[in-house]
């Protein structure tokens, strides 16, 4: 990987594809007559965003944790600094948007106002297994903010010896929860929106971040062209099979 002042250049390409997938899923996919295009799961762009977020946040926390330990500074100050940065980066624009929509009486804003300001709209979406009208794209932001509430404490106060186990356990719990939702027939939207059920993607990103720092030999092997192209091919086949069965169901 190429780094430029702690910036990983390759991730920009992944962000670009994730943005394209999400935008296409929201604004263009249903405009096509082709059943193949309409059935393709472009919504997985959100999952890619979660993986990237898990990777970046975990790497930032682990790097800063090492610096604070070396300087013998208190970790609670690192947590404080982390939340201040997150607040300044996200909250001003987010809340400005919410209150502008409230001021112009945007449809459904009053109905969902408190869910929006508390970053819990995904919980409502999970309970009702339905998109909140006009605000269906806010759920992923809620998941991210809930992730930020919990993850720094785990990354900073769990010892390095046990950190990898905690991350793997998080992924396992998330996948188990998704299976439970599936077998209980609680709905695909609820399954996708519940915070714990999104932790498999966030956790995967975190695990890759951990390996990139503490298991570099393994990480370099996984980042080899053969492994990379194999994963891409496998994932493409998976999407093809899912699209095929979705088409069969629609027909």
What are these regions (language model features)?
Residues 1-201, 218-229:
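Membrane-cytosol interface segments of multi-pass membrane proteins
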Residues 220-251:
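Alpha-helical transmembrane segments and terminal signal-anchor/GPI-anchor hydrophobic tails
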Residues 207-218:
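Internal transmembrane alpha-helix with an interfacial aromatic "cap," most often the third helix
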């Amino acid at each position: 990987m190429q780094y430029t002042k702690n910036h990983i250049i390759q991730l920009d390409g992944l962000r670009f594809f994730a943005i394209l997938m999400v935008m296409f899923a929201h604004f263009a996919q249903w405009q096509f007559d082709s059943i193949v295009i309409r059935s393709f799961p472009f919504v997985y762009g959100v999952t890619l965003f979660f993986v990237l977020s898990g990777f970046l946040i975990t790497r930032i926390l682990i790097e800063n944790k090492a610096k604070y330990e070396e300087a013998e500074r208190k970790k609670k100050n690192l947590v404080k600094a982390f939340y201040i940065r997150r607040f300044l980066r996200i909250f001003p624009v987010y809340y400005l948007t919410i209150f502008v929509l409230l001021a112009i009486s945007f449809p459904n804003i009053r109905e969902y106002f408190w869910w929006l300001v508390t970053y819990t709209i995904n919980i409502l979406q999970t309970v009702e297994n339905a998109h909140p009208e006009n605000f269906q794209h806010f759920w992923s932001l809620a998941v991210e903010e809930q992730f930020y509430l919990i993850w720094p404490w785990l990354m900073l106060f769990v010892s390095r010896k046990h950190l990898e186990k905690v991350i793997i356990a998080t992924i396992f719990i998330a996948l188990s929860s998704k299976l439970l939702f599936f077998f209980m027939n609680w709905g695909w939207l609820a399954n996708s929106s519940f915070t714990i059920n999104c932790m498999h993607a966030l956790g995967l990103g975190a695990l890759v971040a951990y390996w990139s720092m503490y298991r570099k030999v393994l990480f370099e092997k996984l980042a080899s062209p053969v492994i990379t192209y194999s994963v891409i091919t496998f994932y493409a086949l998976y999407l093809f099979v899912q699209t095929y069965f979705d088409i069969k169901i629609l027909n």
